[in-house]
Amino acid sequence: MKTITIAAEEAKELVWQKLDGAGLNERDAEKVADVLVHADLRNVHSHGVLHTEHYVNRLLAGGINPGAQPVFKETGPVTGVLDGDDGFGHVNCDMAMDHAIDMAKKKGVGMVTAVNSSHCGALSYFVQKAADEKLIGMAMTHTDSIVVPFGGRTPILGTNPIAYGVPAKHKKPFILDMATSKVAFGKILQAREEGKEIPEGWGVDENGEAVTDPDKVVSLSTFGGPKGYGLSIVVDVFSGLLAGAAFGPHIAKMYNGLDQKRKLGHYVCAINPSFFTDWDTFLEQMDAMIDELQQSPPAVGFERVYVPGEIEQLHEERNKKNGISIARSVYEFLKSR
């Protein structure tokens, strides 16, 4: 058996111990562990605790600042920039969203870019935070070049995910978190850890040919052809250029040069519906929209219609009770001394 099930709290503690042992301060270790386990609870294992070993190696090599002290500067009535001091992206995105939420509550909208950052994990964590405050949340981050542009064979863009969180009155928030590539590269890593093949179309080899062996994947494809390609560029503009960071092939690689600071950028936004329309009416209409989608007749071969993020929310409810599934090799690393 190549996977093992453990309690979420045990996973958090094990991740915290590993990061703490690598010199990371307590506050940041707790936040990184929380974001990673959030992903595993939702069965998004590509962004879960499997990344711990990489983070430890990068900390020890000097590629992440273990004592980072992020600094926020308000640049306008509803805008700001957070300098992440080359610390963890999980911490920087979280702080950036906190500032965006604060501005949105007071002024209707808050937009923050984060610079001098690193990998930030699942964006759903941060937009969920806004939705829990009955605000609309949006987050984007660029990554190093691993995705070929539509019609090309050389990787120039990153997986460049984008996420939205929209609150409802009684229903769970609408959470959309997606890579603009066909899949996140973490899914390739997960398949490698679990010894599984991948669906054709996820990735290509050095010749640009589609492969199902995850060990042969050198680049990913965009989702939806030119549509995903276009959205990927938008993400690089917002989280790269707008943040004063690099883009595409000029970004330090995640899995090479572990001693290099990655200097990633992120973009987060929070919107207060009450500055645009009646707050209760908005939340009630969101309930109605979700309900109509869920009650719509399913197509042949489908059990029912789900809204984006709903399946992950159901996984989270179950996994909080039953535990999260992780690769045995990942668990063995977490338990090692």
From Swiss-Prot:
It is found in: Cytoplasm. Pfam families: Ldh_2. The keyword Oxidoreductase applies. Signal peptide: none annotated. GO terms for cellular component: cytoplasm. Induction: Induced by galacturonate, repressed by glucose. GO terms for molecular function: oxidoreductase activity. It is an enzyme of class 1 (oxidoreductase). Its EC number is 1.1.1.-. Keywords: Cytoplasm, Oxidoreductase. The keyword Cytoplasm applies. InterPro entries: Mal/L-sulf/L-lact_DH-like_ah, Mal/L-sulf/L-lact_DH-like_NADP, Mal/L-sulfo/L-lacto_DH-like_sf, Malate/L-lactate_DH-like. Belongs to the LDH2/MDH2 oxidoreductase family. Member of the exu locus which is required for galacturonate utilization. NCBIfam families: PRK15025.1. This is Uncharacterized oxidoreductase YjmC.
